Amino acid sequence: MNIRKLNKFFTNLFLKFNIVTSKTVDINKLKLLINLLKPIKTNHKLIRIGGKNDGGYLIPDDLENIDCLFSPGVSDVASFEQDLIKRIKGLRCFLADFSVQNSPIKHKSINFEKKFLGSISNEKFFTLKDWITKKTKSKNDLILQMDIEGFEYEVLINTEEKLLNRFRIIVIEFHNLEKLTEEFAFKFISAAFEKILKTHMVVHIHPNNTVKHLCRKYKGLELPSVMEFTFLRKDRIKTFTKIERFPHILDRPCTKKRADFILPDFWYH
Protein backbone atom coordinates (compact mmCIF):
# COMPACT_ATOMS: atom_id res chain seq x y z
CA MET A 1 0.00 0.00 0.00
CA ASN A 2 1.57 3.33 -1.06
CA ILE A 3 1.66 6.49 1.07
CA ARG A 4 -1.34 8.06 -0.67
CA LYS A 5 -3.58 5.03 -0.03
CA LEU A 6 -2.30 4.49 3.52
CA ASN A 7 -2.94 8.11 4.47
CA LYS A 8 -6.47 7.95 3.06
CA PHE A 9 -7.17 4.66 4.89
CA PHE A 10 -6.28 6.05 8.33
CA THR A 11 -8.03 9.37 7.64
CA ASN A 12 -11.26 7.55 6.80
CA LEU A 13 -10.90 5.30 9.85
CA PHE A 14 -10.33 8.16 12.31
CA LEU A 15 -13.15 10.26 10.86
CA LYS A 16 -15.63 7.38 10.75
CA PHE A 17 -15.23 6.66 14.45
CA ASN A 18 -14.36 10.26 15.45
CA ILE A 19 -11.05 9.08 16.93
CA VAL A 20 -9.07 11.79 18.73
CA THR A 21 -5.51 10.78 19.58
CA SER A 22 -4.38 13.60 21.90
CA LYS A 23 -5.54 16.44 24.13
CA THR A 24 -8.10 18.65 22.40
CA VAL A 25 -7.27 22.22 21.40
CA ASP A 26 -8.83 25.33 22.90
CA ILE A 27 -11.76 26.31 20.66
CA ASN A 28 -10.72 29.98 20.68
CA LYS A 29 -7.30 29.10 19.24
CA LEU A 30 -8.98 27.16 16.48
CA LYS A 31 -11.41 29.98 15.66
CA LEU A 32 -8.54 32.46 15.53
CA LEU A 33 -6.65 30.31 13.02
CA ILE A 34 -9.72 29.84 10.83
CA ASN A 35 -10.26 33.60 10.87
CA LEU A 36 -6.74 34.09 9.47
CA LEU A 37 -7.48 31.60 6.70
CA LYS A 38 -10.68 33.18 5.42
CA PRO A 39 -10.34 33.73 1.65
CA ILE A 40 -10.57 37.16 0.05
CA LYS A 41 -11.69 38.44 -3.34
CA THR A 42 -8.87 40.41 -4.99
CA ASN A 43 -8.31 42.53 -8.09
CA HIS A 44 -7.47 39.29 -9.96
CA LYS A 45 -10.44 37.13 -10.96
CA LEU A 46 -10.16 33.39 -10.39
CA ILE A 47 -9.81 31.00 -13.32
CA ARG A 48 -9.93 27.21 -13.38
CA ILE A 49 -6.73 25.48 -14.45
CA GLY A 50 -6.76 21.74 -15.14
CA GLY A 51 -9.49 19.14 -15.31
CA LYS A 52 -13.14 19.29 -14.35
CA ASN A 53 -12.57 17.11 -11.26
CA ASP A 54 -9.51 16.11 -9.20
CA GLY A 55 -6.40 17.80 -10.57
CA GLY A 56 -8.13 21.07 -11.45
CA TYR A 57 -7.68 24.16 -9.26
CA LEU A 58 -8.85 27.76 -9.09
CA ILE A 59 -6.03 30.30 -9.25
CA PRO A 60 -5.82 34.08 -9.81
CA ASP A 61 -5.63 35.24 -13.42
CA ASP A 62 -2.18 36.75 -12.83
CA LEU A 63 0.15 34.63 -14.94
CA GLU A 64 2.35 37.05 -16.87
CA ASN A 65 6.13 36.65 -16.56
CA ILE A 66 6.00 33.40 -14.61
CA ASP A 67 8.89 31.13 -15.59
CA CYS A 68 8.40 27.83 -13.80
CA LEU A 69 5.87 25.58 -12.11
CA PHE A 70 7.07 23.29 -9.33
CA SER A 71 4.57 20.48 -8.82
CA PRO A 72 5.48 17.81 -6.23
CA GLY A 73 3.07 14.91 -5.86
CA VAL A 74 2.29 13.15 -9.13
CA SER A 75 -1.02 11.48 -9.96
CA ASP A 76 -2.08 9.55 -13.04
CA VAL A 77 -3.17 12.80 -14.68
CA ALA A 78 -1.41 16.15 -15.10
CA SER A 79 -4.19 18.37 -16.42
CA PHE A 80 -3.08 21.33 -14.28
CA GLU A 81 0.40 21.22 -15.79
CA GLN A 82 -0.91 20.71 -19.32
CA ASP A 83 -3.27 23.66 -19.05
CA LEU A 84 -0.61 26.01 -17.67
CA ILE A 85 1.82 25.04 -20.45
CA LYS A 86 -0.81 26.13 -22.98
CA ARG A 87 -1.48 29.41 -21.18
CA ILE A 88 2.07 30.51 -20.29
CA LYS A 89 4.52 30.65 -23.18
CA GLY A 90 7.86 29.07 -22.34
CA LEU A 91 6.74 27.72 -18.96
CA ARG A 92 8.91 24.96 -17.56
CA CYS A 93 7.23 22.38 -15.31
CA PHE A 94 9.13 20.43 -12.69
CA LEU A 95 7.39 17.36 -11.25
CA ALA A 96 8.59 15.09 -8.44
CA ASP A 97 7.32 11.95 -6.72
CA PHE A 98 9.24 8.93 -5.44
CA SER A 99 6.16 6.68 -5.51
CA VAL A 100 5.80 6.71 -9.32
CA GLN A 101 8.21 5.91 -12.12
CA ASN A 102 7.50 8.71 -14.58
CA SER A 103 5.44 11.77 -15.34
CA PRO A 104 1.93 10.89 -16.58
CA ILE A 105 2.54 13.09 -19.63
CA LYS A 106 5.47 13.58 -21.99
CA HIS A 107 6.23 17.13 -23.10
CA LYS A 108 9.40 19.08 -23.77
CA SER A 109 8.48 21.47 -20.95
CA ILE A 110 8.07 18.67 -18.37
CA ASN A 111 10.95 17.54 -16.17
CA PHE A 112 10.31 14.66 -13.74
CA GLU A 113 12.42 13.63 -10.76
CA LYS A 114 11.81 10.44 -8.77
CA LYS A 115 11.99 11.94 -5.29
CA PHE A 116 9.66 13.03 -2.52
CA LEU A 117 9.62 16.63 -1.31
CA GLY A 118 10.44 16.89 2.38
CA SER A 119 12.45 18.70 5.04
CA ILE A 120 15.76 16.93 4.29
CA SER A 121 17.71 15.95 1.18
CA ASN A 122 18.93 12.39 0.67
CA GLU A 123 18.55 9.57 -1.87
CA LYS A 124 14.75 9.57 -1.45
CA PHE A 125 13.87 13.16 -0.50
CA PHE A 126 14.92 16.69 -1.34
CA THR A 127 14.04 20.07 0.10
CA LEU A 128 12.23 22.74 -1.87
CA LYS A 129 15.33 24.92 -1.71
CA ASP A 130 17.61 22.22 -3.12
CA TRP A 131 15.11 21.36 -5.85
CA ILE A 132 14.71 24.96 -7.04
CA THR A 133 18.45 25.64 -6.87
CA LYS A 134 19.09 22.55 -9.01
CA LYS A 135 16.45 23.28 -11.64
CA THR A 136 16.39 27.02 -12.35
CA LYS A 137 18.55 30.14 -12.26
CA SER A 138 15.59 32.36 -13.14
CA LYS A 139 14.86 35.37 -10.97
CA ASN A 140 11.27 35.64 -12.24
CA ASP A 141 8.22 34.51 -10.32
CA LEU A 142 7.27 30.86 -9.91
CA ILE A 143 4.14 28.81 -9.15
CA LEU A 144 3.98 26.02 -6.57
CA GLN A 145 1.28 23.34 -6.75
CA MET A 146 1.71 20.78 -3.99
CA ASP A 147 -0.24 17.61 -3.15
CA ILE A 148 2.12 15.52 -1.03
CA GLU A 149 -0.10 13.66 1.42
CA GLY A 150 0.67 15.46 4.67
CA PHE A 151 4.32 16.35 4.02
CA GLU A 152 3.19 19.88 3.12
CA TYR A 153 3.43 20.97 6.75
CA GLU A 154 7.08 20.10 7.31
CA VAL A 155 7.97 21.49 3.87
CA LEU A 156 6.41 24.87 4.66
CA ILE A 157 7.93 25.06 8.14
CA ASN A 158 11.36 24.14 6.74
CA THR A 159 11.27 26.59 3.81
CA GLU A 160 12.74 30.06 4.24
CA GLU A 161 10.35 32.99 3.93
CA LYS A 162 12.53 34.46 1.17
CA LEU A 163 12.11 31.30 -0.90
CA LEU A 164 8.34 31.14 -0.38
CA ASN A 165 8.22 34.71 -1.64
CA ARG A 166 9.56 33.49 -5.02
CA PHE A 167 6.16 31.94 -5.64
CA ARG A 168 3.53 34.36 -6.90
CA ILE A 169 0.82 31.72 -6.67
CA ILE A 170 0.76 28.71 -4.36
CA VAL A 171 -1.79 25.90 -4.50
CA ILE A 172 -1.64 23.30 -1.72
CA GLU A 173 -3.86 20.39 -0.85
CA PHE A 174 -3.79 20.28 2.95
CA HIS A 175 -4.42 16.89 4.56
CA ASN A 176 -5.58 15.71 7.99
CA LEU A 177 -7.18 19.04 8.85
CA GLU A 178 -9.58 17.24 11.19
CA LYS A 179 -6.56 16.94 13.50
CA LEU A 180 -6.73 20.67 14.15
CA THR A 181 -8.91 19.65 17.10
CA GLU A 182 -5.88 17.96 18.72
CA GLU A 183 -3.43 20.14 20.64
CA PHE A 184 -0.20 18.59 19.34
CA ALA A 185 -1.29 18.52 15.69
CA PHE A 186 -2.72 22.03 15.96
CA LYS A 187 0.69 23.45 16.89
CA PHE A 188 2.31 21.76 13.88
CA ILE A 189 -0.41 22.60 11.34
CA SER A 190 -0.93 26.18 12.52
CA ALA A 191 2.84 26.83 12.35
CA ALA A 192 2.79 25.91 8.66
CA PHE A 193 -0.18 28.17 7.94
CA GLU A 194 1.33 31.06 9.89
CA LYS A 195 4.52 30.68 7.85
CA ILE A 196 2.84 31.01 4.46
CA LEU A 197 0.55 33.81 5.65
CA LYS A 198 3.60 36.02 6.22
CA THR A 199 4.00 36.35 2.45
CA HIS A 200 0.66 35.30 0.94
CA MET A 201 -3.10 35.57 1.44
CA VAL A 202 -5.79 32.96 0.90
CA VAL A 203 -7.88 33.63 -2.21
CA HIS A 204 -9.77 30.34 -2.47
CA ILE A 205 -10.63 27.19 -0.50
CA HIS A 206 -12.30 24.04 -1.79
CA PRO A 207 -12.94 20.90 0.30
CA ASN A 208 -11.88 17.65 -1.35
CA ASN A 209 -14.75 15.14 -1.37
CA THR A 210 -12.64 12.05 -2.11
CA VAL A 211 -12.40 11.29 1.62
CA LYS A 212 -15.43 9.13 2.44
CA HIS A 213 -16.00 10.49 5.95
CA LEU A 214 -15.59 14.11 5.03
CA CYS A 215 -15.16 16.08 8.21
CA ARG A 216 -14.92 16.22 11.98
CA LYS A 217 -17.46 18.21 13.97
CA TYR A 218 -16.01 19.98 16.97
CA LYS A 219 -17.89 22.37 19.26
CA GLY A 220 -20.08 23.69 16.47
CA LEU A 221 -17.33 23.78 13.83
CA GLU A 222 -16.96 21.50 10.83
CA LEU A 223 -13.40 20.63 9.79
CA PRO A 224 -13.13 18.99 6.35
CA SER A 225 -10.26 16.52 6.36
CA VAL A 226 -8.73 17.60 3.04
CA MET A 227 -9.00 21.05 1.47
CA GLU A 228 -7.39 22.78 -1.50
CA PHE A 229 -6.05 26.24 -0.66
CA THR A 230 -4.96 28.84 -3.21
CA PHE A 231 -2.64 31.64 -2.06
CA LEU A 232 -1.59 34.84 -3.82
CA ARG A 233 1.50 36.79 -2.82
CA LYS A 234 0.64 39.97 -0.96
CA ASP A 235 2.40 42.39 -3.32
CA ARG A 236 0.10 41.28 -6.18
CA ILE A 237 -3.00 42.32 -4.23
CA LYS A 238 -4.06 45.92 -4.84
CA THR A 239 -7.63 45.70 -3.54
CA PHE A 240 -9.60 43.03 -1.70
CA THR A 241 -13.00 42.37 -0.17
CA LYS A 242 -14.68 39.61 1.78
CA ILE A 243 -16.15 36.67 -0.09
CA GLU A 244 -19.85 36.40 0.62
CA ARG A 245 -20.73 32.97 -0.74
CA PHE A 246 -19.35 29.57 -1.69
CA PRO A 247 -18.89 27.48 -3.74
CA HIS A 248 -17.33 29.51 -6.54
CA ILE A 249 -19.09 29.12 -9.88
CA LEU A 250 -15.99 27.31 -11.23
CA ASP A 251 -15.70 24.83 -8.35
CA ARG A 252 -16.20 21.17 -9.22
CA PRO A 253 -16.28 18.04 -7.00
CA CYS A 254 -12.96 16.19 -6.91
CA THR A 255 -14.80 12.91 -7.48
CA LYS A 256 -18.17 12.19 -9.08
CA LYS A 257 -18.71 9.25 -6.71
CA ARG A 258 -20.30 11.46 -4.04
CA ALA A 259 -21.75 14.94 -3.71
CA ASP A 260 -19.37 17.85 -3.37
CA PHE A 261 -18.70 19.07 0.17
CA ILE A 262 -19.67 22.73 0.42
CA LEU A 263 -17.32 24.90 2.46
CA PRO A 264 -18.99 25.66 5.83
CA ASP A 265 -19.81 29.36 6.06
CA PHE A 266 -17.71 30.09 9.16
CA TRP A 267 -14.66 29.43 6.96
CA TYR A 268 -15.41 32.60 5.00
CA HIS A 269 -18.02 34.74 6.86
Residue ranges and their predicted role:
Residues L144-F151:
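Switch II (G3) loop of P-loop NTPases
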Residues L95-S103:
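Short, polar loop motifs at secondary-structure junctions
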